[in-house]
């Protein structure tokens, strides 16, 4: 798709009882047929085992008593009634952060995520916290694909449960989705990632996005990323600057709450939108891509 034909609308959804408070935005996308087509995308990141809403006693009254996996399940069911063809992605670190993970090692989180109809999830550093065997066990429990293009799991127990990308179909469109995850050194104990090779995320993104656009003939390419939003060598902005063919980056890792979409120019000078939704499932991002 030609980016000049893309229009994106962003909505932030505050997870309350059922459906939230919204903020709106807009962005660009491409067209395939004479009739305009629309993609509705929900996305989350860094829930950190927040099963129940956060404390009602938080000083920030906009967040107090909100968020959590349980309320998100109900909210997404309501959203699907309005948009049955929506896409839903998670950018990792759904693990670690509450007694539920300490006691059950991720079973509760995966069980609830299985109720949400996720289309793809990437790997955060905290998914490694109970070791590779446990991570592989959880990924096999999942009824959604785990995508990560820059971790090489060859020869490990996760080799057959992680894909570099998936190709999805909605409204007559092909959507390519690939995952990127951060360098493990300094974030993951060596014993918990033994045998896993970290691949350069910029080179990987460039190669994978090209495969999705040129070989798989995808109309839209989405990167579900746990690289983070910050200044440095290996963050979402650097990935975009060193690649082409990516239409949208859904981020995580740095717990950044973006009130609006951020834009970074790719190798061809196109503006690529990036979004991230803080932490603890308080917010769910909603992006509408109108392809005209």
Model regions: which residues?
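N-terminal secretory signal peptides that target proteins for export/translocation
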Residues: 1-9
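Generic alpha-helix initiation/capping and coil-helix boundary signal
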Residues: 9-10, 198
